[in-house]
C-alpha cells in the first residue's frame, strides 16, 4: 500500500508535469509562508479555486502517508512521523527543482509546500491515532468491565 501511494505521489508531482516541451525554470521560494500568504490574498480577492486547491491540496495529498505509517507501525512516534513526512516532501521538492533547472518540468521548489505537506502527514498520523484511541476506549468501556461494574449496571 505504501509503495502504491509513493508511486501515485511521484506520478502526481513529477510525471504528470513532464512533457516533450522544453520549459523555463520557474524558480524557488525559500521564504516561509510567502506562497501561503499569496494564496490567502487570492482567496480574499475571490480566487477561491486556485487558493483552495493549492493550500488544501498540498495538505490532503499527504494525509494518507501519515495514516499508512501509523498502520504499518502502531508504536511510531510523532517525531519520527514528522521527520519521515518532511523528508518525503523534501525529496519531491528537490526532484522538482532539479528537473525544472534541467528544463524538463515547469515546477518550483517551495518551502511552503514542505510545510503544508508535512502538516498533511501529521494530520494523517493524528487521525489514525485518534481513531485507534477511540476504538480502544469504546472496546474497554463496553466489553472489558469487571464483574462488579457489570453487577452495578444490572441493579440500576
Provide a role label for each language-model segment.
Residues 110-121:
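Membrane-interface transmembrane-helix boundary segments in multi-pass integral membrane proteins
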Residues 1-107, 122-156:
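Bulky hydrophobic segments
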Amino acid at each position: 500500500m505504501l509503495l502504491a501511494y509513493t508511486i501515485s505521489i511521484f506520478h502526481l508531482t513529477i510525471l504528470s508535469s513532464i512533457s516533450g516541451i522544453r520549459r523555463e525554470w520557474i524558480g524557488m521560494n525559500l521564504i516561509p509562508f510567502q506562497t501561503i500568504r499569496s494564496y490567502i490574498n487570492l482567496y480574499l480577492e475571490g480566487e477561491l479555486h486556485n487558493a483552495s486547491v493549492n493550500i488544501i491540496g498540498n495538505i490532503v495529498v499527504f494525509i494518507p502517508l501519515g495514516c499508512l505509517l501509523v498502520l504499518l507501525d502502531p508504536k511510531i512516534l510523532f517525531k519520527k512521523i514528522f521527520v519521515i513526512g518532511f523528508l518525503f516532501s523534501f525529496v519531491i521538492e528537490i526532484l522538482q527543482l532539479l528537473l525544472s533547472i534541467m528544463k524538463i518540468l515547469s515546477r518550483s521548489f517551495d518551502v511552503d509546500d514542505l510545510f503544508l505537506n508535512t502538516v498533511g502527514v501529521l494530520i494523517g498520523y493524528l487521525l489514525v491515532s485518534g481513531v485507534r484511541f477511540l476504538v480502544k476506549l469504546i472496546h474497554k468501556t463496553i466489553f472489558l468491565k469487571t464483574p462488579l461494574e457489570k453487577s452495578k449496571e444490572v441493579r440500576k
